[in-house]
């Protein structure tokens, strides 16, 4: 085990940063821990013990790495581990040294449809979301998993179960009353904003398919979001609603959209106000215009908590912004503005920036994106107004606290050591 790990790290030192390395070597270590040195055990007992070891440790690793636990994981492991070990891997190795086409084709066929089946099963199987636990609790959970794999006579398993229960049931600290926690996710060249109050959650847009599956949904699980009280889809564009199917697995209290005809059961984000836990929410709507494109139909959301405000405009263009200014005027004032259309030249006009007069402007854009968002013109315009520009492509996800004390901003990507900092930051 140690030699294999050393060989992998020798040829690819960065493999230690990969999830696959931790899962592969972690589960093999669990098998060795549970099965090595056991006397007077038959093959069936050894197989059951190995399955038990893989399931217990994967519970901790999957919960920490992906913030969710596939409930069918133990059953899938019980079937797939011997299938890969005794069928697919031998066929692949044999096909690499024996130039016999039917054998190679059979191996490729079985491997392809096995992976297709596993991907399908992952999509349809229920999952249990796990909040991101602090490091001390994670260490205790790993110790608990190892205790569960010790011989039964030691009497430590009940304590291990208690520790694992604490890991699985952990919930992050709640947002205080009359305050809001806002997270602008790093959704690549897309947009997704989570607004949390003491007891409620609203998600504005879902980003792209890839961003939702690999980042947003796991991040929602890690944040302890078990239900979305409102899901807002600003308009029908893949960088704003591409992750709808993935996020749609999370229960929600209603879907609101700028183009509700594209989503079953959705309602239009027309002008309406509501309050959650002392925090005011309002959908703003530009004046009616003719020949509006999809971007111009974007939902516009304003959130006010203790006098501090957030404004999100989706992909609203400059004409829509000017319409908002004419309709709402100084009531648009917000300390945090998520720039329209990822910082494109089609949004963030000088008139609009004057009306909103934000302290922070956030550009949700992908690193080195082909559109060069946020554009140089928008950056210059923002800085000319004395506004601090924050970018998800450089800083990752951004978090804002709204309350009576004003706005507190921080980035979620925290570097502890100087060598972890990227050159472009």
Which sequence ranges carry the predicted segments?
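Active-site HxH/HxHxD metal-binding segment of metal-dependent hydrolases
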Residues: 232, 238-271
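Metallo-beta-lactamase
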Residues: 228-239, 337-341
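Membrane-interface micro-motifs in multi-pass membrane enzymes
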Residues: 1, 16-27, 342
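Core dinuclear metal-dependent hydrolase active-site scaffold
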Residues: 7-16, 122-230, 264-336, 394-425
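Cap/insert and terminal regions of metallo-dependent hydrolase folds
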Residues: 323-397
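Transmembrane helix-bundle segments that form internal channels/tunnels in multi-pass membrane proteins
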Residues: 6, 10, 19, 29-183, ...
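Active-site environment of divalent metal-dependent phosphoester hydrolases
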Residues: 16, 210-211, 236-242, 262-264, ...
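A short helix->loop->beta-strand "cap" motif at the edges of active sites that frequently abuts
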Residues: 200, 251-260, 357-360, 385-387
